[in-house]
Amino acid sequence: MRQIVFALSFALFSASSAHAIECLNGQSGDILSLESWELLDRENEAEKTINIALHHSGPVGIRLIDATVRFEDVLGERIGEFPLERADGIGAGQDHILNAVVAGTILERLENLHPDDVIGIACVSALVYEDGTLQDFSD
């Protein structure tokens, strides 16, 4: 299977973008950092797989999480959202890869926009740390 890779370092281009992406409704954008993303071909040409690399730099691992990765263009128009699986544990200082199938207008936008014009953020609504501490950002 041929791979189309759009691996991007979000730290490089989000600092120079015209629009700063933010989490909504009291969600936290400080728990997980969005490191890169890539589109991979699938057998069905109308779909691709998106791999999103996240990093948790906190001192305590996460055992349960309610989070979504959002993408926008640098002018602030929404491209799409990808929810994390709630039960995916993420160790302290560890990376996590979110895999999702992408199709339709989301895929078209990701393929047609220049990679420097796509920005993303991982927004956390709530989580349970490995030590049992519950943190809810909607309060």
Segments predicted by a language model, with ranges:
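Low-complexity, acidic Ser/Thr/Pro/Gly-rich terminal tails and inter-domain linkers that flank the onset
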Residues: 20-53, 57
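Short, acidic/polar linear motifs in exposed loop/turn regions
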Residues: 56-61, 75
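Solvent-exposed strand-loop boundary residues in beta-sheet-rich modules
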Residues: 73-77, 131-133
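Short, hydrophobic/aromatic beta-strand segments
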Residues: 61-68, 78-83
